[in-house]
């Protein structure tokens, strides 16, 4: 059987060790004779899963004690609404950094609940898209919070700086880059992340929220999106996505076994440098993002001759290199190389790219 590498942007590749363990435990979890999918979320067995997964996540990210960790439904899109409805309080404006497709999607949703101060931080120089340094962002004085997306999956644009905005409440959509490297949680008021890219399977959303921000929700906010309600009920106000929670917990343990986020940072940098090096080597492939803002997680690229795209994708698929088609908005190709992607997968891709260029360049 051909070795398959899944470059999907999400739902994305999971560590093979996690999949093997889940397969082994699927029908007889912890000797219970049932699957983890079948047991009560309030059973002592699943409560252990919940407690261990939170502890492991706190260890990985070094989450301070004054932050709550919530395991939620709804994906990042639900948080586009939950953030303003939980954090606005008596204010009517928030700063929204517009750096790409997903940041703009959050802005569009927030417009239903407040007047976003939209700050476009993109730059375009010599055909390359980049992001202004944070010190140039024109933040307002009366905003309830500052929202931004550190990694844009579609355009492959990353904001690698950590925020330093004094006492402003910073909210970040870390859906596609959480757990890829260490970050300083104390610089943020809220971090949220859909699980299906760099955590686990689709269906779970993580929210990390500073305790002093709880209890400010709009009266019309549905309880299922109320951070205080979720925190007071240990993320079990209603039945949580138990299987996704369990698998994410296995991923957290796998990350710790691999050496933690410092080790992930080294691996992810090495994978990204290998792939960008292959793209930059000649003019056959190209990436249209400024070097300082290139994403380690999502690498879009195009060919000088776009008529070769379909052939590239079909031949790549035949070689076990799956899900390389670019997003419908951007076209071209895109390789998503999250934590679970081994460097062998990136090497297989770059070898194929070099061979394809030799034959069609």
UniProtKB/Swiss-Prot annotation:
GO cellular component entries: cytoplasm
Subcellular location: Cytoplasm
Binding site for pyridoxal 5'-phosphate: 76-77, 102, 153, 173, 196, 238-239
EC numbers: 2.6.1.52
Keyword annotations: Amino-acid biosynthesis, Aminotransferase, Cytoplasm, Pyridoxal phosphate, Pyridoxine biosynthesis, Serine biosynthesis, Transferase
Task performed by this protein: Catalyzes the reversible conversion of 3-phosphohydroxypyruvate to phosphoserine and of 3-hydroxy-2-oxo-4-phosphonooxybutanoate to phosphohydroxythreonine.
Listed pathway(s): Amino-acid biosynthesis; L-serine biosynthesis; L-serine from 3-phospho-D-glycerate: step 2/3; Cofactor biosynthesis; pyridoxine 5'-phosphate biosynthesis; pyridoxine 5'-phosphate from D-erythrose 4-phosphate: step 3/5
PROSITE patterns registered for this protein in UniProt: AA_TRANSFER_CLASS_5
Zinc-finger recorded as keyword: no
Protein name per its UniProtKB record: Phosphoserine aminotransferase
Cofactors: pyridoxal 5'-phosphate
Cofactor comment: Binds 1 pyridoxal phosphate per subunit.
Predominant place of localization: cytoplasm
Reaction catalysis annotation: O-phospho-L-serine + 2-oxoglutarate = 3-phosphooxypyruvate + L-glutamate; 4-(phosphooxy)-L-threonine + 2-oxoglutarate = (R)-3-hydroxy-2-oxo-4-phosphooxybutanoate + L-glutamate
Molecular-function annotations in GO: O-phospho-L-serine:2-oxoglutarate aminotransferase activity; pyridoxal phosphate binding
Family: Belongs to the class-V pyridoxal-phosphate-dependent aminotransferase family. SerC subfamily.
């Amino acid at each position: 059987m051909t070795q398959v590498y899944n470059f999907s942007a999400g739902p994305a590749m999971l560590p093979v060790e996690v999949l093997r363990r889940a397969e082994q435990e699927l029908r007889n979890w912890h000797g219970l004779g049932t699957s983890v999918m079948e047991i009560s979320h309030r059973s002592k067995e699943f409560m252990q899963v919940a407690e261990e997964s939170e502890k492991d996540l706190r260890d990985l990210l070094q989450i301070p004690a004054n932050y709550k960790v919530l395991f939620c439904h709804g994906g990042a899109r639900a948080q586009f609404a939950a953030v303003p409805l939980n954090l606005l309080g008596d204010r009517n404006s928030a700063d929204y950094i517009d750096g790409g497709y997903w940041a703009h999607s959050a802005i569009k949703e927030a417009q239903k609940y407040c007047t976003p101060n939209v700050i476009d931080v993109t730059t375009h120089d010599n055909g390359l898209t980049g992001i202004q340094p944070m010190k140039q962002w024109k933040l307002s004085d009366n905003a309830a919070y500052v929202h931004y997306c550190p990694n844009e999956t579609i355009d492959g644009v990353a904001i690698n700086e950590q925020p330093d905005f004094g006492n402003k409440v910073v909210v970040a959509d870390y859906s596609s880059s959480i757990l890829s490297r260490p970050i300083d949680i104390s610089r943020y008021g809220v971090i949220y992340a859909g699980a299906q890219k760099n955590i686990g399977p689709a269906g779970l959303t993580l929210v990390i929220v500073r305790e002093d921000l709880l209890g400010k929700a709009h009266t019309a906010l549905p309880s299922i999106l109320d951070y205080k309600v979720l925190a007071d009920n240990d993320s079990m106000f209603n039945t949580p996505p138990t299987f996704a929670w369990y698998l994410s917990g296995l991923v957290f343990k796998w990350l710790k076994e691999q050496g933690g986020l410092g080790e992930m940072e080294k691996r992810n940098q090495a994978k990204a440098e290998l792939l960008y090096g292959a793209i930059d080597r000649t003019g056959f492939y190209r990436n249209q993002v400024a070097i300082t803002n290139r994403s380690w997680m999502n690498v879009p690229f195009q060919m000088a001759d776009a008529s070769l795209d379909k052939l590239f994708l079909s031949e790549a698929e035949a070689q076990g290199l799956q899900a390389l088609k670019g997003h419908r908005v951007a076209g071209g190709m895109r390789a998503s190389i999250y934590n679970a992607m081994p460097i062998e997968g990136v090497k297989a891709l770059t070898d194929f790219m070099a061979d394809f260029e030799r034959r069609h360049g």
